[in-house]
Amino acid sequence: MIEITAEIRAFIDKVAVGVELAEDEYIDPSDGLIHCKKCGGQRQTVVPCFGKSGYFMPRCICQCQQEAEEQRKAAEERKRRMERIKRRKAQGLQDRYLYDYTFANDNGQNPLMDKARAYVENWKEAYKNNTGLLLFGDVGTGKSFFAGCIANALLDRDVPVLMTNFPTILNRLTGMFSEDRADFITSFDEYDLLIIDDLGVERSTEYAMEQMFFVIDSRYRSRRPMIITTNLKLAELKNPPDLAHARIYDRILERCAPILFAGKNFREENAGATKQAAKDIVNRKSE
């Protein structure tokens, strides 16, 4: 700010005549400029007219206004972020039940869940180093829940994640022309993390194996991490039955660290609880 000389002060006082003030403003007698009643900061300044004589007095923002503007922008960004997360969840979690696969819904019975939390907390490193996971083990041991918790936690952090399976992918590819299929597979690169659930449940036709290879190979070449869940044994993955499977499994094993799920069958336990709840309902007498 320039020094308020007698000449400038005379100019200020002349301009100030009849000026309209907001309710939270006043003219400070010490400099004749508009100030904020709350913080006392200037809302007006004096600037020389370069190239010619004279001055002009533009408005400026005080600390209160600056803070209010920052809060407004922060609120807008939070709103945009929440809307973006909502859209990404709708795109990335295509099955509604996956929304319930969260750390908040973890019953604490699977000690491997600490590894899922660690993966999320160290996501930046995992992404940078293209570190994926291979979750293998018997049916119902919590592999999909483990992967879903990671997906939801990262989506809540505004990380693009897609959790899908090969039957769904193959169904989408059916009827597409070759160029459309290539574009569809390439679209997976828009996601920082790709989760393929239940590898091995799809039909092993020549067409299916070819499309599966294209998906895994595209991900492999993009150097972006993926998480694979499967009921196959690690020995089956390391000793595939043919070249078509070998090309897929080799890429997965190179990029994904294996984690064995060998615990109890949570689905059987949940089914038992469901049966008991149903029994309680149907046997309950009307009041």
Task: Place the predicted regions along the sequence by residue.
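A short, basic N-terminal segment
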Residues: 1-107, 269-287
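Pre-Walker A (pre-P-loop) alpha-helix and adjacent loop at the N terminus of AAA/AAA+ ATPase modules
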Residues: 93-133
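Short glycine-rich substrate-engagement loop in P-loop NTPases that contacts/grips substrate
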Residues: 111-120, 128, 151-191, 203-210
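Walker A/P-loop nucleotide-binding motif
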Residues: 127-147
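Hydrophobic/aromatic beta-strand patches that form the interior of the parallel beta-sheet core
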Residues: 133, 162, 195, 227, ...
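Loop/turn-to-beta-strand initiation segments
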Residues: 159-160, 190-193, 222-228
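Walker B catalytic acidic pair
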Residues: 198-199
